[in-house]
């Protein structure tokens, strides 16, 4: 399953996350019960779940009213947190909750220049924040999202100034800025705080990676969590869940046109780029300006390696410009090496590179070294060995499927 958290319009807060997860299908009464029980260790809170509208859109709103606000040191906070033992919470949930608060504590320590054990929780130590985190974590596991591929879109952070325990600070708050380090953010669409430290810490601990756009998926359910304000735009956090259509990842595509390089230099560039970590390199003949023949060099690389590959491309080609296409979606089948026996002048073992979509074999190619070995042993031309081997593999796989037996001669 694939889940996308969408905070690009109204940001993310703790109660918005809980509301969106409940709206997606988490148990509302049990979630509220967990929240109130957790808050009781920090002064207590009342939790209510209701359906509201924000700028005309329906959403679930979770209202948490704390009886009092605690201001505690991080170590004392952890001690109080250890006292939470609701029967609906297991060790994995409690571990994730601790990770969320640790994320906040690390951010606070960084922005204030203190050690972790010197961090003092103010707003985050309040019962409502504890309720939000425990409720969000419970709902997350209640929906089994911990087994999904979870992504986030860019986070709207708002703007202006916000008053906290340390007086006025710019939006996003320093702790929020630290928590969202490495994640794409956008300002606005209003001059208020839209991304809170609690909501941001939940987000970064829930997601696998960030994306600018939705991944390929078949949408099955959507949940909307409302914020407390009702401005002119929909103040909601959206969570979308569905099934992945094809296994996929994202890569960066680099390309440039050259018309001044010899075949020897182009061959060397090809090898150097692959050695530098490029996933694939292609050279395509093109006609350039003034009808000059040239080459289009295309390089596919991992997103976190494109700058290094880009440097190699500039230095090796001497080109003055490279087109960069970030976040290119690429369908990728699961790849596996399987062994099978083939009958080519006797029974012989060969390895096949197999592409799988789920449990279904979509593609199979004999490994070149094994095909060459069989060709040398039998005197049969290589292309015939490849054709015969792959046909036998397909027949063997078909027979195994018919017998509903996963082995069928395949290892």
Swiss-Prot record:
Keywords assigned by UniProt, alphabetized: Nickel
Domain of life: Archaea
Keyword Disulfide bond: no
InterPro entries reported in the protein's UniProt record: Ni_insertion (IPR002822)
Gene Ontology MF terms in the entry: lyase activity; nickel cation binding
UniProt similarity note: Belongs to the LarC family.
Name of the protein in its database record: Putative nickel insertion protein
Species the sequence originates in: Methanothermobacter thermautotrophicus (strain ATCC 29096 / DSM 1053 / JCM 10044 / NBRC 100330 / Delta H)
């Amino acid at each position: 399953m694939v889940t996308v958290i969408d905070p690009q319009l109204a940001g993310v807060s703790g109660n918005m996350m809980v509301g969106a997860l409940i709206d997606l299908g988490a148990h509302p009464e049990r979630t509220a019960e967990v929240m109130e029980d957790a808050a009781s260790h920090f002064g207590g809170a009342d939790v209510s779940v209701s359906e509201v509208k924000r700028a005309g859109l329906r959403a679930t709103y979770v209202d948490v009213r704390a009886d009092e606000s605690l201001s505690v040191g991080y170590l004392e906070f952890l001690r109080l947190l250890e006292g939470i033992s609701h029967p609906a919470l297991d060790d994995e949930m409690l571990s994730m909750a601790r990770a969320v608060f640790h994320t906040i504590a690390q951010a606070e320590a960084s922005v204030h220049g203190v050690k972790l054990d010197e961090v003092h929780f103010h707003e985050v130590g309040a019962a409502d924040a504890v309720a939000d985190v425990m409720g969000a974590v419970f709902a997350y596991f209640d929906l089994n999202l911990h087994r999904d591929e979870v992504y986030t879109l860019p986070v709207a952070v708002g703007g202006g100034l916000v008053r906290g325990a340390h007086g006025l600070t710019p939006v996003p708050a320093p702790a929020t800025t630290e928590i969202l380090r490495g994640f794409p953010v956008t300002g606005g669409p209003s001059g208020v705080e839209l991304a809170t430290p609690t909501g941001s810490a939940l987000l970064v601990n829930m997601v696998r990676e960030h994306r600018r756009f939705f991944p390929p998926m078949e949408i099955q359910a959507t949940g909307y969590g409302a914020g407390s304000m009702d401005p002119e735009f929909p103040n909601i956090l959206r969570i979308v869940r569905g099934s992945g259509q094809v296994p996929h990842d994202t890569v960066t595509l680099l390309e440039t046109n050259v018309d001044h390089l010899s075949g020897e230099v182009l061959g060397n560039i090809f090898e150097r780029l692959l050695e530098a970590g490029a996933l694939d390199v292609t050279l395509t003949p093109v006609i350039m300006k003034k009808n000059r023949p040239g080459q289009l060099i295309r390089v596919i690389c991992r997103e976190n390696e494109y700058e290094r590959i880009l440097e190699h491309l500039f230095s090796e080609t001497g080109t003055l410009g490279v087109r960069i296409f970030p976040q290119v979606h690429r369908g990728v089948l699961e790849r596996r090496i399987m062994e099978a026996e083939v009958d080519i002048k006797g029974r012989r073992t060969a390895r096949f590179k197999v592409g799988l979509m789920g449990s279904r074999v979509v593609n199979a190619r004999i490994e070149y070294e094994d095909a060459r070995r069989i060709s040398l042993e039998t005197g049969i031309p290589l292309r015939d060995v490849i054709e015969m081997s792959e046909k036998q593999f397909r027949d063997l796989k078909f027979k195994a499927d018919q017998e509903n037996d996963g082995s069928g001669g395949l290892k």
